[in-house]
């Protein structure tokens, strides 16, 4: 092996600073980063950076306009999304902005109220507390019954310590605004008697933020049938009470409705259909609940089934709002649903009452979206209907749409005639692998 090399360490001599400078033995200045001149920079900017620059410039311009010309600044519209979980408590949803699309005046609102049916006692939505008390009374009347029917409420004896714990959860949920939810509350959907435990927490006294968190937890854990019960017994009464008391809806409750759409079948059966079947749905409720449907993506089958039920039930002004919102989604509806919508409009041919503008708007939406999915007989019947039920602004547009329709039976006949002249292909046994 060779000898190890010595480290090349420069010896430092005791010389004064003047000699070090003159001899050039001081450390040289390192090359600093050169600043590029603006002319030397690349002229090409990628699309993403340019979008950020334009957005920042637009935001700055809006801020300057707000400071200098506040009267010229337009009010911004709020875009709702499922991720809007952290919202201030005082933010609310008002139906005034949503009514702009419906183009209604005071006379139209009066016509809407004429078609509002009186609430039937058997159709009213029951609160969870009332239903729990009914079940307790039934159990006391029938001591020998140990197990309730499947799908009904499970009433069991509750340990005093468990009851005391959930009373503490109740106090937390009353004043909850943000933060973590108690773990004892999160396990309620997994319990067999979850309705009875939920009754201890008093859902009607929850804060709006607690209702949103509860809806998020229950819709993710419960099945479709159990989620439907939660929507019907807890969420729907709370939203309607909030609208009735404050004339507007808290943003947390609105987000809870949007979160409930994660279970679309439960949402339709537990909220929309009970709301309309009662016949006492107000215009404010119809607009706000309908906006959730209009702004969310719903599977076609669930939308079709709900639209079919709405077309077949007794009419109220709120039905037309939901029919219009569902038709505006432009889904490929089955012919059975299209036929039900046609019969829904035709049954008013001999009705002597003046129909609200909402009915005419829903008919126009149907003609615009599904004019090519109706038969020739249905088109003629609708044109005949327009002679008896007309609106000076909307009916001409409906008639024009129907007259320009390509009916489905005509298209089927043309398709069959086009295929009639073509020679039919003869398949052999080899083609279907039948030989051997």
Swiss-Prot record:
Modified positions (Phosphoserine) in chain numbering: 148, 152
Protein name: Bystin
Signal sequence, start to end: none
Its job: Required for processing of 20S pre-rRNA precursor and biogenesis of 40S ribosomal subunits.
One of the Pfam families matching this protein, by short name: Bystin
GO process terms (BP): rRNA processing
Family per record: Belongs to the bystin family.
Keywords for the protein's UniProt record, in alphabetical order: Nucleus, Phosphoprotein, Ribosome biogenesis
GO molecular function: snoRNA binding
Annotated GO CC locations: cytoplasm; nucleolus; nucleus; preribosome, small subunit precursor
Phosphothreonine modification, residue list: 145
Keyword S-adenosyl-L-methionine listed: no
Native organism: Drosophila melanogaster
Location in the cell: Nucleus, Nucleolus
